[in-house]
Amino acid sequence: MFVDSVEIIIASGKGGPGMVSFRREKFVIKGGPDGGDGGDGGDVYFEVDNNTDTLASFRGTKHHKAKNGAPGGTRNCAGKKGEDKIIVVPPGTQVFVGDELWLDLVEPKERVLALKGGKGGLGNAHFKSATKQQPTYAQKGLEGVEKCVRLELKLIADIGLVGFPNAGKSTLISTISNAKPKIANYEFTTLVPNLGVVSVDEKSGFLMADIPGIIEGASEGKGLGISFLKHIERTKVLAFVLDASRLDLGIKEQYQRLRLELEKFSSALANKPFGVLLNKCDVVENIDEMTKDFCAFLNLGAQKLNEFGLEPYLGFLHPHLTNDFENNPNEQSALFVLPLSAVSALNVHALKFVLLEALP
């Protein structure tokens, strides 16, 4: 089950109490105080684990508490520190206290101290003085800290697929990567984001995210809009997946409406580097003219794929992706326009190289 938001209560351990005890030795009637200090309470840490991409493990487990410190012992023996609580989260997890962002956990294997355990109490050996040789007092340990926090997951991927429902994003990610999403010929088949690893060759690859289809008004929360859109905020490059076979909504209109939703949600998201994939091109007769016309619509001075050793079937690249172009393109310029068919795998092999080159 994919879960991207959950509330939990975290608490550090209480410090152990100090000990009240006195030295007992043969021929010593009243030995001095030798009560040890209590152990410190356990700390709470968040740790990033690359092997998980959901917060589902937190469902049904609301309280996460470190152990209390042990009491001090006799003969000045200190109590054992309470066991720390390590809370494992996927990369991209944000921790909120109320509406305020407290922690942003991104780096693999990153471990961050969230709550410090309570200090252990001092044993009675600390309270001996010239006027009080037999102190019968020891400190209690300090209480731990408790917080109610909200965990929000924003997936981290190199490429984010953006498109309307039934555009073929799930089929594409299942064809090009190791992801196995549910696929069917109706809208909203995908109800949760999917992550897939795309292997280009033995040394190269990237992570791709397929978010559920965007509908108009998604930026205002329609459908599950905002909860979906947040998952592509961290992606490096966006790939708009357009359905070239649609008769009721042309590819230009699809692109404009998708871009409008991104702009409404976040200007930073709308300004990310992007490319366009014209899916289902194998059932469109005039795909060549459609692709050229769309490139002109984007003001893309593109060049055909076969000029750069890729498959000689239609697709166009921004010169930025070639070795003979040294300057960076305009941020609003498409990096590529590539017709493909996720079902028949047409141009999918070329797509791997195009996406790899598009990454900064």
From Swiss-Prot:
Q: Which GO terms describe its molecular function?
A: GTP binding; GTPase activity; magnesium ion binding
Q: Which GO terms describe its cellular component?
A: cytoplasm
Matching Gene3D superfamilies:
GTP1/OBG domain (2.70.210.12), P-loop containing nucleotide triphosphate hydrolases (3.40.50.300)
Cofactor(s), names only, from the UniProt record: Mg(2+)
What transmembrane ranges does the database entry give? Answer: none
One Pfam family for this entry, by name? Answer: GTP1_OBG
Question: What is the documented function of this protein?
Answer: An essential GTPase which binds GTP, GDP and possibly (p)ppGpp with moderate affinity, with high nucleotide exchange rates and a fairly low GTP hydrolysis rate. Plays a role in control of the cell cycle, stress response, ribosome biogenesis and in those bacteria that undergo differentiation, in morphogenesis control.
Protein name per Swiss-Prot or TrEMBL = GTPase Obg
Question: What organism does the UniProt record list as the source?
Answer: Helicobacter pylori (strain ATCC 700392 / 26695)
Q: Taxonomy-wise, where does this protein's organism fall, top ranks first?
A: Bacteria, Pseudomonadati, Campylobacterota, Epsilonproteobacteria, Campylobacterales
